[in-house]
């Protein structure tokens, strides 16, 4: 059809008129050619007038509407351009260029107006079907799929077109798609390739920094940040981020040095001062750190970050009530009703989490219920409190109600979908829950697969969790979260050797992953195997996060298993200071006292553990019974 219209438009050009001058075909042809000539000469207003006249004379001509759309887009009149491109595609559904232009206009607008994403996807999909080998269309469609939350479809669109491997736009979109769909092993290669294609590309550099941070490879991130700092010496946020990533990567002395230099140069840099405070705290200089954070709060009582940082530092030192008081003071400053409702909700959600950690469950639930779901979305910490209490109190209907509210507020969040399915199964609506988990497990996005595996683990269906995670690892090679879930599920099914192999594979990819070092080291220690190796792992985990109570407990436990009771007491006591309401730490302290023959002290710890909801209360009760003490 398009060829027919083109023929009519150019018919007889330069020859004697075939039709009378008033013939509409002649009028359209002359007006169209006048528009094209004016456009070529840069006379855009004249061209626009002629194109509009041509569209009036030939309202059913797709080429006229398309050319008008192209000019309007060039002139920045995007809304009218989109209308004309859509009209051209409507008149000729096989007009690939019209579909591509309509989709491109929607895609350009979608960054600021997400409501344009679906129409961008629809138009670009039609263009892609009409010209499946067009690399520009494939790259644009992939970008649209990314914006729609379907990175799996984005990658598929790129795979449809051979020869895109060296296309700069495709390299970028491929990296983003693999990252967002959770194909971490492939994404690592993609980001390396993107940056190698042009090391001076700032977008590639900053995107790579964010990617490596998300992978918790802070060493790589710091190297790239330093490269960026060399190019942008006056970029203070880059310097701040170097200090922060050194801290997050366990390089505490370097982080302190960087942060001190920043503070000396710019005392008003609050971010650098917070990082310095955190570096001091993690190196055991908590008094200096607290003093610094309190000074930040005194200087600006309305800074929520300083208040939350101080609160969690105090909580980590076993000072829960003091931590809660810091945040409550901040909330009180916002007034009632609060001057900043969403900020108040966020901080109160943190209070709910601290109350829960202190086992003040009723208070935690009350605040969590008031803050879990708001107009800005879900407060993860509050919702977590409500769901965990629903499990512990065996109130699955409550859990289902809250999970559905969260899923309604954030329909794209797979964790809430998994929670809905979990509580549907708990309430007896098994068919609905099973279907949701099956759909998540089959997803082309790793985060959804992980949500299904996590839900199965919460339901204590460890074999199913392991199977889902194993299938996911095959499809999303190098996804460390799925690998970790696979290892933990295998461990819970008693497959210790298989679990160990998975965790060791993670450590080959990320040798300083503190959580993996802790899990694997504790697993070996608890089973009484490979104790020297377990101790080295746990010492490394503690070196990476010295104030982590769970890591300290694990290190104390492996020392106990090796009969190094002095070191066991040292680390278990530190763990008890950090997490005084932890049942496992109290049980381990009881076992330590029993090994020493101090049965009265052992029973005190075991009884304390029983009040803290241990995973295996019957085992602890048996220890008390066997000791001869009164239950």
What is the predicted function of each stretch?
Residues 20-30, 337-343, 375, 437-441:
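TPR-adjacent "capping" and linker segments in tetratricopeptide-repeat scaffold/adaptor proteins
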Residues 67, 101, 140, 173, ...:
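Canonical tetratricopeptide repeat
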């Amino acid at each position: 059809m398009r060829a027919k219209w083109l023929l009519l438009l150019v018919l007889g050009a330069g020859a004697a008129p075939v039709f009378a001058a008033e013939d509409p075909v002649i009028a359209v042809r002359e007006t169209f050619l006048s528009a094209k000539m004016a456009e070529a000469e840069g006379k855009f207003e004249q061209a626009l007038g002629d194109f509009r006249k041509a569209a009036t004379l030939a309202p059913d001509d797709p080429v006229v509407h398309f050319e008008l759309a192209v000019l309007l887009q060039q002139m920045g009149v995007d809304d009218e351009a989109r209308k004309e491109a859509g009209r051209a595609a409507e008149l000729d559904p096989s007009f690939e260029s019209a579909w591509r232009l309509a989709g491109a206009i929607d895609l350009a607008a979608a960054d600021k107006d997400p409501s344009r994403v679906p129409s961008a996807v629809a138009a670009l999909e039609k263009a892609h079907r009409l010209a499946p080998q067009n690399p520009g269309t494939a790259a644009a469609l992939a970008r649209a799929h990314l914006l729609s939350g379907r990175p799996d479809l984005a990658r598929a669109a790129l795979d449809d077109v051979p020869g895109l491997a060296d296309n700069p736009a495709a390299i970028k979109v491929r990296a983003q798609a693999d990252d967002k769909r959770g194909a971490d092993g492939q994404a690592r290669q993609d980001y390396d390739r993107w940056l190698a294609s042009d090391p001076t590309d700032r977008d590639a550099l900053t995107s790579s920094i964010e990617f490596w941070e998300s992978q918790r490879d802070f060493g790589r991130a710091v190297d790239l940040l330093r490269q960026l700092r060399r190019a942008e010496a006056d970029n203070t946020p880059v310097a701040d981020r170097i200090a922060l990533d050194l801290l997050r990567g366990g390089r505490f002395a370097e982080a302190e040095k960087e942060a001190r230099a920043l503070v000396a140069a710019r005392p008003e840099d609050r971010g650098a001062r917070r990082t310095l405070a955190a570096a001091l705290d993690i190196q055991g200089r908590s008094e200096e750190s607290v003093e610094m954070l309190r000074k930040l709060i005194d200087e600006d009582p309305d800074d929520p970050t300083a208040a939350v940082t101080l609160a969690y530092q105090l909580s980590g030192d076993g000072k829960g009530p003091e931590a809660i008081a810091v945040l409550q003071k901040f909330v009180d400053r916002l007034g009632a009703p609060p001057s900043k409702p969403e900020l108040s909700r966020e901080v109160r959600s943190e209070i709910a989490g601290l109350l829960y950690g202190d086992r003040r469950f009723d208070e935690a639930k009350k605040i969590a219920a008031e803050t879990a779901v708001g107009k800005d979305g879900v407060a993860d910490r509050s919702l977590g409190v409500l769901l965990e209490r629903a499990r512990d109190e065996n109130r699955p209907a409550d859990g289902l109600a809250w999970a559905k509210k969260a899923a309604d507020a954030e329909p794209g969040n797979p964790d809430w979908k998994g929670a809905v399915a979990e509580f549907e199964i708990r309430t007896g609506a098994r068919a609905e829950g099973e279907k949701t988990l099956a759909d998540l497990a089959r997803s082309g996005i790793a985060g959804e697969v992980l949500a299904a595996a996590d839900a199965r683990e919460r339901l204590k269906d460890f074999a199913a969790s392991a199977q889902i995670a194993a299938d996911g690892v095959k499809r999303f090679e190098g996804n460390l979260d799925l690998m970790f879930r696979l290892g933990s599920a295998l461990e819970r099914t008693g497959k210790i050797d298989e679990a160990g192999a998975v965790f060791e594979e993670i450590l080959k990819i990320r040798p300083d992953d503190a959580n993996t070092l802790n899990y694997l080291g504790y697993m070996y220690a608890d089973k009484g195997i490979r104790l020297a190796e377990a101790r080295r792992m746990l010492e490394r985990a503690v070196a990476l996060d010295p104030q982590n109570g769970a890591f300290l407990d694990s290190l104390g436990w492996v020392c106990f298993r090796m009969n190094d009771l002095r070191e066991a007491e040292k680390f278990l006591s530190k763990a008890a200071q950090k997490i005084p309401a932890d049942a496992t730490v109290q049980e381990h302290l009881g076992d330590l006292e029993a090994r020493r023959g101090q049965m009265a002290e052992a029973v005190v710890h075991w009884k304390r553990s029983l009040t803290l909801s241990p995973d295996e209360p019957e085992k602890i009760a048996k220890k008390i019974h066997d000791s001869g003490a009164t239950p």
